[in-house]
């Protein structure tokens, strides 16, 4: 069974472009304790935008 406070939890990255598009990834909680912001491609907008971690 998975621990409730896993070191590498699964997180959702939601587009800031307002399209609602999400990426699902894992992050290391020890190295990145704050919310992640990653610049990735949004296929709905057909451009790169910031994706923010959603909890």
From Swiss-Prot:
UniProt KW Ribonucleoprotein keyword: yes
Query: InterPro entries attached here?
Result: Ribosomal_bL33, Ribosomal_bL33_CS, Ribosomal_bL33_sf, Ribosomal_zn-bd
Q: Which GO terms describe its molecular function?
A: structural constituent of ribosome
One Gene Ontology cellular component annotation? Answer: cytosolic large ribosomal subunit
SUPFAM superfamilies, sorted: Zn-binding ribosomal proteins (SSF57829)
Q: Does the keyword Ribosomal protein apply?
A: yes
GO biological process entries: translation
Give UniProt keywords alphabetically.
Answer: Ribonucleoprotein, Ribosomal protein
In the record, the note on similarity to other proteins reads:
Belongs to the bacterial ribosomal protein bL33 family.
Q: Which PANTHER family match?
A: 54S RIBOSOMAL PROTEIN L39, MITOCHONDRIAL, LARGE RIBOSOMAL SUBUNIT PROTEIN BL33M
Name-wise, this protein is Large ribosomal subunit protein bL33B
């Amino acid at each position: 069974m998975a621990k409730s406070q896993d070191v590498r939890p699964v997180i959702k990255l939601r587009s800031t472009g307002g399209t609602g598009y999400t990426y699902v990834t894992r992050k290391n909680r020890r190295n990145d304790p704050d919310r992640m912001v990653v610049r990735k491609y949004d296929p709905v907008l057909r451009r790169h935008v910031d994706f923010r971690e959603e909890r």
